[in-house]
A protein has these predicted regions:
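A short, acidic, amphipathic alpha-helical segment used as a generic capping/interface helix at domain edges
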Residues: 150, 256-273
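Helix N-cap/beta->alpha junction signal
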Residues: 164-166, 278-280
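Iron-sulfur-cluster electron-transfer modules
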Residues: 1-126, 135-163, 169, 179
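Ferredoxin-type iron-sulfur electron-transfer modules in oxidoreductases and energy-metabolism complexes
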Residues: 1-18, 255-263, 295-300
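Short cysteine clusters
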Residues: 129, 207, 245, 279-282
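Short, flexible loop segments at boundaries between secondary-structure elements
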Residues: 181-201, 234-243, 290-300
Length: 300
């Protein structure tokens, strides 16, 4: 990987991310009407002390992949304002992606309502967590933006958060460490009760859930308890054997990201033809190379 190229990519990404996040709480131009339609459709209460926090991850997952392809072009444009304008016109979620993430988010909401009837959502006022800043190593910006997110939640009197993806959960864990973020949060996977599911899958572990958040065993217990069969191979799905989907490196090198995803898909499908994931970015990266389902698509 060319060092100068990576540095140029990094500078472009930093410029775009920081400006968009500080101004609009999202990393890239996003149609929030589309991103929140899942909640309008089922009349999720607005606000409240306990909220489901999407951080727009399912809504943006496939859009992230599209942005990665345009980063070299954006790098030659210079102005983040120009980048944002062009990005908003070039990059929009496909109808099938919208339908899919709406169904997933609605199912997750129905699942968590079994443990608490009073769960709201911030709709268009929801902030992105800032996970990209942390994962790309922009630590000063991560802390600064994290304080804005923390303050926004406090303004909305949020006292309990339900996260739905590993990147957001890991980000809040690190905000707790770095800026004293003290609002309790729980992954929705830990709240699943009396769920039913079908199918036979090999599980692609989220690096964050399994390695950093200690959920390797609990996720498997949840899936199996719902009636879904998991096929294991210790050399592929063992606690120390899994490897990245390639997503995190995508903003810096889309080609390398795809090579990693293809290699991971090949090892997974050597165990079972159908793959299960617990992360929207893992889905976006792997689905080009194998048949993938999200946990929230196979249990309810």
């Amino acid at each position: 990987m060319d060092e100068d190229y990576v540095k140029k990519q990094e500078a472009t990404i930093r410029n775009v991310l920081v400006k968009n996040l500080m101004e609009s709480y999202v990393p890239f131009p996003l149609d929030k009407k589309i991103a929140t339609q899942w909640a309008y459709a089922i009349n999720v209460p607005r606000g409240g002390s306990t909220i489901i926090y999407t951080s727009y991850m399912y809504q943006m997952a496939n859009v992230f992949k599209s942005y990665e392809k345009y980063v070299p072009t954006f790098g030659s444009l210079g102005s983040s304002k120009i980048i944002a304008s062009i990005g908003a016109k070039l990059i929009k979620p496909k109808e099938e992606d919208i339908k899919r993430f709406n169904a997933i988010l609605q199912n997750i909401y129905r699942i968590v309502k079994r443990s608490n009837e009073n769960i709201g959502y911030l709709y268009e006022e929801e902030p992105y967590s800032g996970s990209l800043l942390y994962e790309l190593g922009f630590m000063d910006e991560f802390k600064e933006y994290g304080k804005k997110v923390f303050e926004l939640f406090k303004q909305h009197k949020v006292s309990n958060i339900i996260t739905i993806d590993p990147h957001t959960t890991n980000t809040l864990t690190n905000l707790k460490k770095y800026i004293g973020f003290d609002i309790p949060f729980t992954p929705y996977l830990n709240l699943i009760k009396e769920a039913k599911g079908t199918g036979k899958f090999v599980l692609h572990d989220s690096c964050l859930y399994s390695r950093f958040l200690g959920m390797y065993e609990s996720i498997r217990t949840t899936i199996r308890s719902a009636g879904v069969e998991l096929v294991e191979d210790p050399t592929v799905t063992g606690k120390g054997a899994g490897f990245c989907c390639g997503g995190p490196v995508g903003p810096l090198n889309d080609k390398l990201s795809n090579e990693i995803a293809k290699a991971r898909a090949e090892t997974l499908t050597s165990v079972n033809k159908d793959v299960l994931v617990a992360c929207p970015l893992c889905y976006a990266n792997l689905s080009e190379f194998c048949n993938v389902k999200d946990i929230a698509e196979v249990i309810a």
